[in-house]
Amino acid sequence: KVYGVAKWGETPLEGVEVKLAGEGLEDISATTDAEGKYELTGVKADEAYTLTAEDKTGEFRAVESQEVNSDVDTEKNFAFSIIPISVSIDKTGVKPFSYKRALDFSGTAVKAYVVKKVNRNYTELTEIQKVPAGCGVILKADADEHSVTPVEKADAVEGNLLVGTVDKEFTIEAASVGKAWSLKKNDGIMQFMSEAGTKVAKNSAYLAYESTESVIYLNQTDGIRVITTSGNGMLDESKPMYNLAGQMVGKDYKGVVIQNGKKYNK
């Protein structure tokens, strides 16, 4: 018999078709199991066979065939490498996203963010480079097709409020209004909205957060709704203040500043 295992790194690959073929000989084939293992029996002694392994998912690069010519049990293993995926970012520069395998965004032009906190009516984004399988993220990049390489594993992300839709699309039902939010562009601003009947596409993500706000903005600057002036006791110049670009400013700064999710004319 001929036996072995098909792997991607340390990950066993199920469903790989392994075949023995020889001139004038009947093909012998098997499919790898959940542990990536296969076994071919009925191999004729002293015959020349070519052993091939084919990934039917299209996720992995083809591997070289191997020659088999033996009258004893022979172990033949296959090491597959994965093909990078293409991630399309439209002109908004923003994309809610999830994928069935872990992804590594380091070294790419794409930045990946999770949401660990909602501050009133805007999200606070945390950048991560390695995204676990199935994890919902917000991607930011220039409009283009970006190549990203799947990896075997990535550390779990605790407290992420984004839910990935890897297996199927998600519909916001009436009972989920105010609890599930889809990201869309409205009046030129990226914002999460919670409307019954809204469909979130497969391989996307939605925000799972209970709120009575009408919208939840993606960015702090967009989420500021209260404009007031200094001198009314609300602005505390001893605490951090930021300009509209998100840069910390000092007490001498003049203009619009942001503090604790509010905008002030200073």
Kindly label every feature range from the protein language model.
Residues 1, 73-83:
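Conserved "repeat-terminator" motif of extracellular CCP/Sushi domains
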Residues 2-14:
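Structural motif
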Residues 23-39:
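Short, acidic Ser/Thr/Gly-rich low-complexity loop/linker segments typical of extracellular
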Residues 40-44:
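Short, flexible loop/turn segments at beta-strand junctions in immunoglobulin-like
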Residues 45-57:
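A short, solvent-exposed beta-strand micro-motif common in secreted/extracellular proteins
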Residues 55-76:
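Structured interaction patches on ligand/partner-binding surfaces of diverse proteins
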Residues 82-106, 129-224:
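A short, polar beta-strand/turn micro-motif
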Residues 222-266:
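C-terminal outer-membrane/trafficking sorting elements
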